[in-house]
């Protein structure tokens, strides 16, 4: 309206015309009769009949696959041994159950519509299913939110630990509040799903839309309600308008969860990387890249303008860009390795722990053993905890790191305790090492020298004298002590006390192994022996030392007299051999040793931090893959939701996005189970695997289970159900060579599916089953390669003909004894044990593993040889019976004749027959059922241990008798 007396406002008229056009365009939205009756705007969720059929089939298929995967995942979770479970597994089960419920609800609606299409127009039907759908989806979102909160607390509140009464483990995170998880997960989604019925009785007014398609074949009532749920193509959910329904009740919380997951992960990433850099800065930079960069800068600047441009381009563009790309890669791959950090610990020129030394000069604590395995091995890997090898320096890293959990062991009991990085502990330990190895003005005292004696740190000796020729053969203290006896020229503070020198006038002191009691005993008993400077030296070094000593004895002089030009003229200034220079060089050697000690302990601390960081990275990859997979699952539904605001209302749905959206919505359960199986590997936590581990730890010192224990297990209640069985008995019943064709077929079918489950690319049906001699040698830990048949030798004959000669009465008697000892497992339990995670324990295989592991492990104790041989000189003619090998079940019945013999044989089975000691004092008792080394056997015949030694070995194997 134009007011009289005032000129018309052209801008206002133009704005009003544009607004009217916009309103007209909204009123001209195309729609269908079904959308108008349901209250759906425009062309939202408008499909043809074939498209609807395809979408519903996709939804049913994806939901069914997800349900099957959920059942499989719950089976593996339920069959994990309770000793191996931690709170994380409870959260995984909680997440799988929520996603399982969501997949089940999403499958109900399309199935009912395909069965009875008329219920599509029933408001009670789609409102009820819509409430359950919203409840299940929001419950799954709440579960992943709780998952993220739990791991955020583990990182930022590592001291929140509580004892798990069920397993005895220390649990963190939300473990103390675990009783609130299920109520919150049920209550919050129920409230959100119920709020959708606000304004349910309020009707939508879409009378101005243009109907272009009449598809009301379902007799919908003419009452488009604003609140409630709407039937979509393959599911029932919240209405797209008003927007607050889906934003407040569904997508808003979901976007918040996604942002929260990214924020938690980003904060953890920044926290760990910053702490790693701070620790590295506190304990020192081991790469020494600053000096190299300065040299490179001077070199490039010397090339003129082109060199300067190259340096600026590399410093301010290339390197920052590469650093950014590496950080992005590390962020998305959950890696905490510094892009500028060298990952090679081998001690190369660019290695992290290189201090200008060659690889041969790396300290022992950074080296691996001769077998190639790390010295820090868990007890389950053998008797490493009792390893005391005098030929090898002690590994100080074991003691310096004793307060920290074993980061290399994949132990489920520790997996949640190792995702925190405590820099204060690492730095404090490094400071403790500095204090412990502080050098006073007088030099290192005896105790410090003793501690340093365990490490093979190199010291660059700058003495240019004939003394240096003995440095590689004898300790410097050997020569200086003898010189001191001659003229008192050299005074070395690192020598032993005068009392020790007076008691051992002709002995050379071994400073590198001052803790070795055996060397002290040898010095007391043999006054004219020259101890080797390093027990790891070869025989040539020993021969050289003996030759030197022989020369000393022949000349009847002190070893110092054999040194060329060792006279007063030798120490004149012209010869650069003054007493002060020798003392100064010795002090510099000690200071150099101390510097190396400090650097090596710094490197050790940093290496420990790197191990912990690697464990954190591994565990974070295991736990954050669930939230990240959640984000990946909701990627296409988010795209589909974004298209609904404008594009779908005007033009209808984008079909390829809708297909993917319909497929991935129910697949959360499938993804959770795949991640769980891939990362957790629950088949390694079955009862059989866990019980086998505990049995190995129990019998590892004994070296075998023993026939008595095997039969005891087999005849127990669990053994009668097949949880404990003997491989010998099972192999003898092999169906591969049975005369019954049906049994042969079933054997091949069972072998096929077994290899299929193990994901073997090459199927092999060859087996030595039913070969009596082969399996007897195999389970006795003997070399059975000579007895192994080839496939060309196999013939389909009777099992008794293949295994036993028909004319052998002895073997036939053994077969009868085996049959009498066998335990018949019911058919039901035999079928059960073919199911994954429900297998039994092969006691024969476990016994064989114990024997092999015991033979390959170093087993020695401090002073064990001395305890075994302390009375050897008094009992040289005492013979010990060597017939104490435990017989297998094939021969046990032929040995026992009466009660007295039974008790004697049982006593023999509890003791070892002999104990052989090698040069480095490693005692290796003969394992029953194995063939001893003929060389060791000959040595034992000439030098057998006394009865007290055998009692000690028996005690170590079986405990107090």
From Swiss-Prot:
Give the subcellular location: Cell membrane
Q: Which residues lie on this side of the membrane: Cytoplasmic?
A: 80-91, 157-178, 274-619, 844-961
Region (Disordered), start-end ranges:
468-568, 783-805
Please provide an example of a Pfam family that matches this protein in its UniProt record: Git3
Bilayer topology reads: Multi-pass membrane protein
PTM Phosphoserine: list the residues: 373, 903
Query: Gene3D superfamilies from the entry?
Result: Rhodopsin 7-helix transmembrane proteins
> Which Gene Ontology molecular function entries are recorded, alphabetically?
D-glucose binding; G protein-coupled receptor activity
Q: Which UniProt keywords apply?
A: Cell membrane, G-protein coupled receptor, Membrane, Phosphoprotein, Receptor, Transducer, Transmembrane, Transmembrane helix
Composition bias of kind Low complexity appears in: 502-558
Q: Which residues lie on this side of the membrane: Extracellular?
A: 1-56, 115-133, 199-250, 643-822
Q: Which InterPro entries does the record match to this protein?
A: Glucose_rcpt_Git3_N (IPR023041), GPR1_C (IPR022596)
Role noted for this protein: Seems to associate with GPA2 and act as G protein-coupled receptor that senses glucose and controls filamentous growth. It acts upstream of adenylate cyclase and is required for glucose activation of cAMP synthesis in concert with a glucose phosphorylation-dependent mechanism.
Which family does this protein fall into?
Answer: Belongs to the G-protein coupled receptor GPR1/git3 family.
Record-given protein name: G protein-coupled receptor GPR1
Q: What broad taxonomic lineage does this protein's source fall under?
A: Eukaryota, Fungi, Dikarya, Ascomycota, Saccharomycotina
């Amino acid at each position: 309206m134009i007011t009289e007396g005032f000129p018309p406002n052209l801008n206002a008229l133009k704005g009003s015309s544009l607004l009217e056009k916009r309103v007209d365009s909204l009123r001209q939205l195309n729609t269908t009769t079904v959308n108008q009756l349901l209250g759906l705007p425009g062309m939202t969720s408008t499909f043809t009949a074939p498209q609807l059929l395809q979408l519903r089939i996709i939804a049913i298929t994806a939901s069914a696959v997800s349900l099957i995967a959920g059942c499989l995942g719950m089976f593996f979770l339920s069959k994990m041994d309770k000793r191996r479970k931690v709170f994380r597994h409870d959260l995984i089960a909680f997440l799988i159950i929520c996603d399982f419920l969501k997949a089940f609800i999403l499958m109900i609606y399309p199935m009912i519509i395909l069965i009875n299409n008329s219920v599509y127009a029933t408001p009670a039907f789609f409102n009820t299913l819509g409430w359950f759908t919203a409840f299940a989806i929001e419950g799954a979102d709440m579960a992943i939110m709780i998952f993220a909160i739990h791991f955020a607390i583990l990182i930022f509140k590592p001291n929140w630990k509580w004892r798990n009464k069920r397993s005895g483990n220390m649990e963190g995170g939300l473990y103390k509040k675990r009783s609130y998880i299920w109520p919150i997960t049920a209550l919050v989604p129920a409230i959100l799903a119920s709020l959708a019925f606000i304004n349910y009785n309020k009707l939508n007014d879409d009378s101005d839309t243009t109907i272009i398609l009449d598809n009301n074949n379902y007799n919908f009532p003419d009452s488009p309600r604003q609140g409630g749920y709407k039937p979509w193509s393959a599911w029932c959910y919240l209405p797209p308008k008003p927007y607050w329904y889906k934003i407040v009740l569904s997508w808003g919380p979901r976007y918040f969860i996604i942002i929260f997951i990214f924020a938690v992960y980003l904060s953890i990433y920044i926290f760990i990387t910053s702490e790693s850099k701070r620790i590295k800065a506190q304990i020192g930079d081991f790469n020494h890249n600053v000096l190299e960069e300065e040299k490179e800068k001077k070199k490039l600047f010397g090339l003129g303008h082109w060199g300067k441009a190259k340096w600026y381009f590399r410093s301010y563009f290339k390197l920052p860009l590469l650093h950014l790309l590496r950080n992005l890669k590390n962020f998305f791959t959950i890696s905490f390795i510094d892009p500028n950090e060298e990952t090679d610990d081998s001690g190369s020129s660019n290695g992290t722990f290189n201090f200008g030394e060659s690889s041969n000069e790396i300290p022992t604590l950074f080296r691996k053993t001769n077998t190639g395995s790390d010295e820090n091995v868990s007890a389950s890997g053998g008797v490493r905890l009792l390893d005391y090898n005098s030929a090898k320096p002690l590994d100080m890293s074991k003691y310096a790191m004793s307060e920290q959990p074993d980061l290399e062991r994949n132990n489920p009991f520790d997996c949640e305790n190792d995702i925190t990085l405590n820099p204060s502990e690492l730095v404090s330990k490094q400071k403790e090492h500095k204090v412990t190895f502080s050098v006073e003005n007088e030099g290192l005292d005896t105790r410090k020298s003793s501690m340093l004696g365990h490490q093979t740190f190199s010291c660059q000796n700058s003495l240019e004298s004939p003394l240096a020729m003995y440095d590689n053969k004898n300790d410097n203290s050997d020569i200086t002590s003898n010189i001191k006896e001659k003229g008192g020229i050299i005074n070395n503070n690192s020598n032993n006390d005068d009392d020790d020198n007076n008691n051992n006038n002709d002995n050379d002191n071994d400073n590198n192994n001052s803790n070795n009691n055996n060397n002290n005993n040898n010095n007391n008993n043999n006054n004219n022996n020259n101890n080797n400077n390093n027990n790891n030296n070869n025989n040539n070094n020993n021969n050289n030392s003996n030759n030197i000593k022989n020369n000393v004895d022949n000349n009847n002089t002190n070893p110092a007299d054999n040194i060329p030009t060792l006279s007063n003229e030798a120490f004149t200034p012209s010869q650069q051999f003054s007493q002060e220079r020798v003392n100064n060089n010795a002090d510099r050697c000690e200071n150099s040793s101390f510097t190396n000690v400090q650097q090596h302990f710094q490197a050790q601390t940093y290496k420990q931090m790197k191990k912990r960081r690697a464990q954190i990275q591994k565990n974070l990859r295991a736990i954050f893959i669930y939230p990240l997979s959640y984000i990946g699952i909701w990627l296409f539904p988010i795209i589909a939701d974004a298209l609904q605001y404008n594009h779908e209302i005007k033009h209808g749905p984008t079909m390829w996005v809708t297909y993917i959206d319909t497929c991935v919505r129910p697949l959360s359960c499938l993804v959770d189970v795949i991640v769980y199986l891939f990362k957790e590997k629950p088949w390694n936590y079955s009862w059989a695997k866990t019980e086998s581990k505990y049995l190995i730890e129990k019998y590892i010192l004994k070296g075998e289970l023993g026939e008595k224990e095997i039969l005891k297990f087999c005849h127990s209640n669990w053994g009668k159900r097949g949880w404990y069985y003997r491989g010998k008995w099972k192999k003898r019943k092999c169906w591969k060579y049975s005369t019954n064709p049906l049994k042969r077929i079933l054997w091949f079918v069972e072998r096929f599916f077994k290899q299929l489950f193990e994901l073997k690319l090459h199927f092999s049906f060859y087996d030595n089953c039913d070969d009596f001699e082969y399996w007897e040698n195999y389970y006795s830990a003997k070399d059975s390669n000579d007895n192994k048949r080839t496939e060309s030798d196999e013939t389909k004959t009777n099992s008794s003909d293949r295994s036993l000669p028909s004319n052998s009465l002895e073997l036939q008697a053994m077969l009868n004894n085996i049959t009498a000892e066998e335990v018949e497992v019911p058919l039901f339990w035999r079928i059960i044990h073919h199911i994954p995670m429900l297998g039994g324990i092969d006691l024969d295989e476990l016994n064989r593993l114990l024997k092999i592991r015991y033979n390959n492990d170093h087993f020695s104790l401090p002073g064990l040889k001395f305890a075994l041989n302390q009375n050897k000189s008094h009992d040289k003619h005492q013979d010990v019976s060597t017939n104490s090998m435990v017989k297998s079940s094939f021969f046990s019945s032929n040995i026992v004749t009466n009660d007295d013999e039974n008790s004697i044989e049982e006593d023999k089975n509890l003791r070892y027959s002999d104990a052989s000691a090698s040069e480095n004092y490693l005692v290796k008792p003969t394992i029953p059922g194995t063939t001893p080394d003929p060389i060791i056997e000959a040595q034992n015949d000439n030098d057998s241990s006394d009865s007290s030694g055998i009692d000690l070995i028996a005690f170590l194997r079986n405990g107090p008798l």
